C-alpha cells in the first residue's frame, strides 16, 4: 500500500524530457492565454517573486496565491480582480478546463433565455454560434490582452465564464452574484485535457508526454491547478452560501439530466412552470444542448471562436469513464489515492 508521499515521489520524471520539449515547443500552435507577450511591468516584477515551475510541455507556470498561471493568464486574472464589477443579476459559470464548461455554457444560456427564443427555435443562437461565443470567458477573452471591456453595454442578466478559483473570483464579485460551478472527476478531466491539448497544439503527442502530463497533474502543476484546491474552493463556497454558489457534478448531469437542469433553473431563479414541464420544455433544452447535437452543427465543426481556438476542439466524446481507455491501472489508483487524501473529510465524494 503506497503512502501519499510515496505516490508523489513516483510522479517526478526526469526534467530532460521537458528540456527536450522546450527545444521544439515553438512549433506548437499557442492560444494567447498561454503566452507571455501581454504582461505589464508591474506584473513582470510580481512574477519574479513567485514560485515557478513548468507544465508538461515546458511552458512556464507561476504560482499566485496557491494557483498556477501562465503569464498572460495571470495578467488577465489581476485585471479581472481590479476592474470586473458584475451586477447582482449577472451569472458566472466557473469550472476547470475540460470540466464540463462547454456543455454547461449551452445549458445555462438555454435555460435563462428560453422564453426569448421559444417562438423561433430554428434561429436559436446555439444553432448559429459556439457556446463559448455566447458565454464569454472573463480572463481568457474579455480581460485578455490588457483589455478593459465596457460591461454596461450587455443586457441583464449577462452570463460570464471563468476558470478562476472561488477565492480569486471573490476579489472581484459580490456574494449576491450567482455562481454555478461544474466539476468532473479528475481522471476524465485529465484525459479530456490531454486530447484537448493535442487538438489545441495541432499535434499528436507521444506516451512519454502523456506521462509527463500525468506527473504534473499529480503534483498539481497545471493551469488553474491544483485540481483539488480548485474543486474544494467551490465546494466549501457552496456549503457556506448555498443561495449564491451551486455545485454541480458532470457525472450527475449525465446520469439524471432532467433533474439537474430543473435544479439549475431553480437556482438561477427561473424555475420551469408546470405548463413548461408538461409541454416538454426541459426535454427540448436537453435535446438542443446535447453534445451530439452541438458537435454536429456546422458552426462547431468548422468555425473558430473569438478566442482564436477552433470550435471543434471543444467537442469530443463527453463520456463518463473514458479514462479507462487511456490510464493504466496504476495511474488510476494513484489518482484515486491522491483525491482521497486531498479531499479528506470535506464531504465531497466522486463515484
UniProtKB/Swiss-Prot annotation:
Gene3D superfamilies tied to this protein: P-loop containing nucleotide triphosphate hydrolases
Pfam families, per database record? Sulfotransfer_1
Enumerate the GO terms in the molecular function aspect: sulfotransferase activity
User: What results from gene inactivation?
Assistant: No effect on sensitivity to salicylic acid.
**Which GO terms of the cellular component aspect does the record hold?**
cytoplasm
Q: Where in the cell is it found?
A: Cytoplasm
- Does the record bear Oxidoreductase in its keywords? no
Predominant location of this chain?
cytoplasm
> What does the UniProt keyword field contain?
Cytoplasm, Transferase
Q: What is its EC number?
A: 2.8.2.-
- Name the residues that bind 3'-phosphoadenylyl sulfate: 98-103, 184, 192, 250, 316-318
Q: What does this protein do?
A: Sulfotransferase that utilizes 3'-phospho-5'-adenylyl sulfate (PAPS) as sulfonate donor.
Q: Which family does it belong to?
A: Belongs to the sulfotransferase 1 family.
- Its protein name is Cytosolic sulfotransferase 11
Name of the gene encoding the protein in the UniProt record: SOT11
Amino acid at each position: 500500500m503506497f503512502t501519499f508521499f510515496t505516490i508523489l515521489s513516483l510522479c517526478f520524471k526526469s526534467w530532460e524530457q521537458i528540456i527536450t520539449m522546450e527545444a521544439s515547443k515553438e512549433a506548437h500552435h499557442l492560444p494567447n492565454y498561454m503566452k507571455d507577450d501581454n504582461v505589464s511591468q508591474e506584473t513582470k516584477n510580481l512574477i519574479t517573486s513567485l514560485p515557478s515551475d513548468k507544465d508538461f510541455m515546458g511552458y512556464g507556470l507561476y504560482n499566485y496565491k496557491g494557483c498556477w498561471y501562465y503569464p498572460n493568464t495571470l495578467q488577465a486574472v489581476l485585471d479581472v480582480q481590479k476592474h470586473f464589477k458584475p451586477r447582482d443579476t449577472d451569472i458566472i459559470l466557473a469550472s476547470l478546463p475540460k470540466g464540463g464548461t462547454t456543455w454547461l455554457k449551452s445549458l445555462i444560456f438555454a435555460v435563462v433565455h428560453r422564453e426569448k427564443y421559444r417562438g423561433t427555435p430554428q434561429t436559436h443562437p446555439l444553432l448559429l454560434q459556439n457556446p463559448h461565443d455566447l458565454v464569454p470567458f472573463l480572463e481568457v477573452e474579455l480581460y485578455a490582452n490588457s483589455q478593459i471591456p465596457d460591461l454596461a453595454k450587455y443586457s441583464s442578466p449577462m452570463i460570464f465564464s471563468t476558470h478562476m478559483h472561488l477565492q480569486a473570483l471573490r476579489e472581484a464579485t459580490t456574494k449576491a452574484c450567482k455562481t454555478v460551478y461544474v466539476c468532473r472527476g479528475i481522471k476524465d478531466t485529465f484525459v479530456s485535457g490531454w486530447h484537448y491539448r493535442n487538438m489545441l497544439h495541432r499535434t499528436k503527442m507521444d506516451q512519454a508526454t502523456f506521462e509527463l502530463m500525468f506527473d504534473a497533474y499529480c503534483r498539481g502543476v497545471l493551469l488553474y491547478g491544483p485540481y483539488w484546491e480548485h474543486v474544494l474552493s467551490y465546494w466549501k463556497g457552496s456549503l457556506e452560501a448555498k443561495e449564491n454558489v451551486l455545485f454541480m457534478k458532470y457525472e450527475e448531469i449525465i446520469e439524471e439530466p432532467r433533474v439537474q437542469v430543473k435544479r439549475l433553473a431553480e437556482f438561477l431563479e427561473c424555475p420551469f412552470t408546470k405548463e413548461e414541464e408538461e409541454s416538454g420544455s426541459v426535454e427540448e433544452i436537453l435535446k438542443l444542448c446535447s453534445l451530439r447535437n452541438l458537435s454536429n452543427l456546422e458552426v462547431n465543426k468548422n468555425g473558430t471562436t473569438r478566442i482564436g481556438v477552433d470550435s471543434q476542439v471543444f467537442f469530443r466524446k463527453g463520456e463518463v469513464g473514458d479514462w479507462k481507455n487511456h490510464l493504466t491501472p496504476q495511474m488510476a489508483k494513484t489518482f484515486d489515492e491522491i483525491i482521497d487524501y486531498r479531499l479528506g473529510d470535506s464531504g465531497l465524494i466522486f463515484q
